[in-house]
Amino acid sequence: MEQVAKLLNGKGNIAILTGPSGDAGGLQRMEGYENILKNYPEIKQVVAPADCQWDTASAQSTVESWLSAYDLDAIVCENDGMAVGAGNAAGANSGIVIAGVDGTPDASKLFRMAVSPVRFLRTAALWAANGIEAAVKLLKGETLDTTEIVTDNTWIDSSNVKDYE
């Protein structure tokens, strides 16, 4: 969300596509989005977040409806599948920032076509490596410094998408 806010120069109209209501990962992402948006009072969430069940077709249908009713500058999606649906609905080079999470090959196609200027990559491999490292420490009787493990994130856009395919 921070990168989206920067791309919008701190102002604009956004909408958010979420996974299933009650999903822990989605709830944490939404909490993070809301915390960041507090720092950007000129960014308005013009429609309530839509539960698209992590589904591409549902996201596409939702965004098609939104685009007929709202002037959107960005659509933030809690996964790349929904970002693909949002990109399909918005069309190539619409100027709408579409952000997704996961780093999937389908989403990479959107970035090669310049449908969206940003995508967030988080990899299961990095999560697994960090988790294994923590587990090994615990098995050795060591104490972890924290209850949270924070992983580095990489922003991907049309300028570097080929590096991540």
Model-identified regions with their sequence ranges:
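A residue-level marker of the well-folded mature domains of exported/periplasmic proteins
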Residues: M1-E165
